Amino acid sequence: MKILLIGYGAMNQRVARLAEEKGHEIIGVIEPQKNETTPYTHYDHITDAQNEADVAIDFSNPNLLFPLLEEEFQLPLVIATTGEKEKLIEKLNELSHNMPVFFSANMSYGVHALTKILEAAIPLLQDYDIELTEAHHNKKVDAPSGTLVKLYDVIKDLRQNITPVYDRHELTEQRTKDEVGIHSIRGGTIVGEHDVLFAGTDETITLSHKAQSKDIFANGAITAAEKLINQSNGYYTFDNL
């Protein structure tokens, strides 16, 4: 499989290493500016590389990605950028009429499993308060994480009229049943931790996922790419790939 990388930060550097270990080829990298230390061919546009690649894997940011998605091309896409999620999904759905597109805010299959466990738990715990917490390294710039937003969306689909609460320090009233607390922690080198707390009367239940290495996200993207290149045009997630 010949892979075009969109972005060459810490995540796509891992993708490159792990993909080559699996026998795949990195044909080039799209970066905002050419970097002499990047060991691959530099491209400015997807259109420049689409005839050389079987798939593009993106771990970048909206500033780099969105202009590229406006180009005229047909190449399977694995997208892991977080930020501006609604705008991104709308654009990817549009592109999916002409190419297979895979998107996940978190490329870990374990996180996908967590969402399925959450879907099963919510109907059983209707009277429990829910609090969501995520923790990441001190270099992560967006908050809450795309994964936590995904977990909140699962809850929103199954509980009617819920309200996200991001900060309680100015509130001087009791917690209401429709609230879902959302908390972000940034520090050190934490790879990624996500907790869903169900708090009931005299008991609590916690669903938790802790990433121990960023390799799980890189491997998840590579596995998605391996499957995606054999799919027909369409919009794919872990639910249907």
Swiss-Prot record:
NAD(+) binds at residues 80-82, 104-107. It is an enzyme of class 1 (oxidoreductase). It is found in: Cytoplasm. Coiled coil: none annotated. It comes from the Bacteria. It catalyses: (S)-2,3,4,5-tetrahydrodipicolinate + NAD(+) + H2O = (2S,4S)-4-hydroxy-2,3,4,5-tetrahydrodipicolinate + NADH + H(+); (S)-2,3,4,5-tetrahydrodipicolinate + NADP(+) + H2O = (2S,4S)-4-hydroxy-2,3,4,5-tetrahydrodipicolinate + NADPH + H(+). The keyword Amino-acid biosynthesis applies. InterPro entries: DapB_C, DapB_N, DapB_N_CS, DHDPR_bac, NAD(P)-bd_dom_sf. Its EC number is 1.17.1.8. Keywords: Amino-acid biosynthesis, Cytoplasm, Diaminopimelate biosynthesis, Lysine biosynthesis, NAD, NADP, Oxidoreductase. The active site is at 136 (proton donor/acceptor), 140 (proton donor). One of its GO terms (cellular component) is cytosol. Gene3D superfamilies: Dihydrodipicolinate Reductase, domain 2, NAD(P)-binding Rossmann-like Domain. GO terms for molecular function: 4-hydroxy-tetrahydrodipicolinate reductase; NAD binding; NADP binding; oxidoreductase activity, acting on CH or CH2 groups, NAD or NADP as acceptor. One of its GO terms (biological process) is lysine biosynthetic process via diaminopimelate. PROSITE patterns: DAPB. (S)-2,3,4,5-tetrahydrodipicolinate binds at residues 137, 146-147. Catalyzes the conversion of 4-hydroxy-tetrahydrodipicolinate (HTPA) to tetrahydrodipicolinate. Belongs to the DapB family. This is 4-hydroxy-tetrahydrodipicolinate reductase. The gene is dapB.
